[in-house]
A protein has these predicted regions:
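Post-signal-peptide N-terminal segment of Sec-exported extracytoplasmic proteins
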Residues: 35-60
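Post-signal peptide N-terminal segment of mature Sec-exported envelope proteins
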Residues: 22-42
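Sec-dependent signal peptide recognition
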Residues: 1-7
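Mature, soluble, non-transmembrane domains
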Residues: 61-201
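Buried hydrophobic packing residues in well-ordered domains
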Residues: 18-20, 26, 146
């Protein structure tokens, strides 16, 4: 999310779709599909520190107006928890993300959505920027979609699937520039990812 915010002034179109699946073995598989405006993608090639939006190893489909970047990754639940804890003291953008084990079967996620009060918001994303309105207009219709899947979604303020195994968060990309106040302060979900018997997991 950090580089997404920092590079927003360069975006003519930015759609993001990310899927995270937490398995019974505590392995998280992630697939992220990002549609970048051609101008943004070309600018990224000149800013090595920002290329995490579409890294060299990403699967790319390039067109005259946009580039589709698909990345896949695997990590463990313990690694994700450690990363969130590290960010808490180092990164003002991601410091409010929470990944907490509830017990041996479930995990609780909290993703902050209070974009109005993000600490360290870049000056380019303020209404003082003469290009602000043009940037906001260019992002109309673009969305950030994040899905979490596990054995069962026990509770969430997101959209839970009919089979109860996944939950979806949809954020209009323009919310990062012009928060409407219609989003909750945070997205929360409690996911059950395995069944443990009397003898443990």
């Amino acid at each position: 999310m950090r580089w997404l915010l920092l590079m927003m002034p360069l975006a003519g179109c930015l759609d993001v779709e990310a899927d995270f699946k937490l398995g019974e073995d505590e392995v998280i598989t992630a697939e992220t599909r990002m549609i970048l405006g051609r101008q943004l993608y070309d600018m990224l090639q000149l800013a090595p520190q920002a290329q995490g939006l579409c890294p060299a190893e990403a699967e790319k489909v390039e067109g005259p107006d946009s580039v589709i970047c698909t990345t896949r990754d695997m990590s463990t639940l313990s690694e994700a928890i450690a990363e969130a804890e590290k960010a808490r003291g180092e990164d003002p953008f991601m410091g409010d993300v929470e990944i907490v084990r509830v017990d041996d079967e479930t995990v609780r996620l909290v993703l902050p959505l209070d974009f109005e009060n993000i600490e360290g918001r870049p000056a380019e994303l303020s209404a003082d920027n003469p290009m602000f309105e043009m940037m906001a207009d260019g992002l109309e219709g673009a969305e950030i979609v994040v899905r979490f899947s596990a054995l069962e979604v026990l509770e969430s303020n997101g959209a839970v699937s009919e089979d109860g195994t996944s939950v979806e968060l949809v954020v209009p990309t323009v919310e990062l520039l012009e928060p409407s106040g219609t989003l909750p302060d945070a997205f929360t979900a409690v996911l059950k990812y395995r069944e443990c018997g009397l003898l443990g997991c």
